[in-house]
């Protein structure tokens, strides 16, 4: 939507909220407005839990998932919850919600309180999360059909206070956005079949003030890959699901463990305040200063390189520089990306912000990542973007129920992909 149209739509909403001193309405308008940017680096902080409680504090003891065949099914039904009390069982197909065909109800679900939705896949995911949320005490009429039953049932469910339980269960934001700092930024292990597994939380070093292993993150990663090389592993899984991003240079340095030749990682294209124009500069990540105009960031040829099959596990919570790990692996001769959906699609340079009335702050990116042809890469446009799987894992009922029960379906498919490349 053009800026003038956005202003025309949201300025009156903000003006009414100001006139009536309705902070909840102002906060929701601010979130809806920033969501139109469709970038994971555009956010409103902090989360206003008063608004969350008022708008989405009630749940129905229900989590739903959309299958590849278009059906919306129950993948978690809380014992003793409203849905279970109405006779709904795991795998039940939701036919209607709040008197509307579920497809329409889903499309009309407000996701103002969700994280940003750069891609269409993320939009649908967030609509599924908030479809089953409502103010406490709200009644919703639902038509559903349990597996094995010949006819559907109709029930009225009442939203109950649940401590935002289902929102917490389905929160797919990046790791550092939703939890405490880990004890180390890189974890490694050897899986059955002599497969190396390494998980990267983010491309930053653990702060010295935080408890844990303060070995530099790059060193931890190189130690892991070098140990796999020495052990002659049959393949490597690099898990960047919900990776929070960080340093682009660190990602390029990670990739040296897989690249025999110097390869462009990106050109960083920044808006120069003095001119308002984009220019390619290499940034000093420690000082924030722009150095080396026109220069790109390169993956240097590694001194010790793994050349066997590599798989990157991704989800939509993998954001920013974390997406660069998936991109670098996908570009390898024996590299594949595995996941139900692609990465977040937010690959620009983040860091700018502005303070807003009522104590809120809006963050946004100020630079672009360009490929060798100096075209924006990975960032979402028109709802499409991110680093996509070579072949998406099918969201079947069986897979959806496995995921909901805690089974690592993505790793299972990742191991299959490795075996196919051996």
How would you describe each model-predicted region?
Residues 1, 11-22, 31-42, 79, ...:
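Sec-exported extracytoplasmic/periplasmic mature domains
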Residues 1-71, 135-141, 146-188:
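Extended, small/polar residue-biased N-terminal targeting/export presequences
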Residues 5-12, 16, 25-32, 36, ...:
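Extracytoplasmic/secreted proteins, especially bacterial periplasmic and envelope-associated proteins
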Residues 18-22, 93-143, 250, 345-348, ...:
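PDZ domains, with a preference for the canonical peptide-binding region formed by the helix
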Residues 32, 48, 66-68, 76-79, ...:
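A mature extracytoplasmic/lumenal domain signature
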Residues 53-104, 205-206:
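PDZ/PDZ-like domain segments forming the peptide/carboxylate-binding groove
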Residues 58-60, 68-73, 90, 138-140, ...:
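Envelope-exposed proteins and targeting segments
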Residues 175-422:
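C-terminal "post-core" interaction segments
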């Amino acid at each position: 939507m053009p800026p003038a149209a956005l202003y025309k739509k949201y300025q009156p909403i903000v003006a009414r909220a100001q006139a009536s001193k309705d902070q909840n309405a102002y906060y929701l308008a601010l979130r809806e407005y920033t969501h139109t940017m469709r970038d994971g680096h555009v956010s409103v902080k902090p989360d206003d839990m008063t608004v969350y409680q008022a708008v989405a504090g009630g749940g129905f003891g229900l989590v739903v998932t959309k299958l590849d065949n278009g059906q919306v099914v129950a993948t978690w039904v809380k014992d003793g919850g409203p849905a279970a009390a109405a006779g709904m069982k795991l795998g039940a197909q939701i036919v209607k919600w709040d008197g509307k065909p579920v497809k329409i109800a889903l499309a009309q679900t407000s996701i103002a309180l969700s994280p940003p939705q750069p891609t269409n896949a993320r939009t649908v995911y967030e609509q599924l999360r908030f479809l089953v949320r409502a103010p406490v005490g709200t009644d919703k009429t639902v038509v559903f059909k349990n597996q094995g039953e010949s006819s559907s049932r109709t029930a009225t469910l009442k939203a109950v206070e649940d401590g935002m339980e289902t929102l917490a269960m389905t929160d797919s934001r990046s790791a550092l956005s939703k939890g405490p700092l880990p004890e180390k930024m890189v974890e490694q292990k050897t899986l059955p079949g002599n497969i190396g597994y390494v998980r990267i939380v983010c491309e930053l070093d653990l702060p010295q003030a935080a408890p844990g292993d303060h070995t530099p993150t790059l060193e931890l990663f190189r130690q892991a890959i070098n140990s796999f090389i020495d052990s002659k592993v049959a393949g490597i899984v690099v898990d960047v699901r919900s990776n929070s991003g960080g340093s682009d240079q660190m990602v390029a340095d990670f990739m040296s463990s897989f690249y025999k030749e110097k390869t462009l990682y990106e050109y960083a294209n920044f808006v120069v305040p003095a001119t308002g124009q984009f220019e390619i500069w290499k940034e000093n990540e420690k000082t924030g200063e722009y150095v080396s105009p026109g220069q790109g960031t390169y993956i240097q040829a590694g001194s010790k390189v793994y050349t066997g099959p590599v798989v990157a596990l991704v989800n939509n919570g993998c954001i920013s520089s974390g997406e660069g790990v998936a991109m670098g692996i996908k570009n390898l001769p024996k590299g594949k990306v595995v996941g139900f959906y692609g990465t977040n699609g937010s690959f620009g340079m983040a860091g700018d912000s502005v303070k807003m009335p009522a104590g809120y702050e809006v963050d946004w990116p100020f630079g672009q990542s360009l490929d060798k042809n100096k075209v924006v890469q990975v960032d979402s446009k028109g709802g499409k973007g991110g680093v996509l799987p070579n072949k998406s894992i099918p969201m079947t009922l069986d897979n959806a129920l496995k995921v909901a029960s805690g089974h690592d379906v993505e790793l299972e498919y990742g191991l299959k992909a490795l075996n196919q490349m051996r």
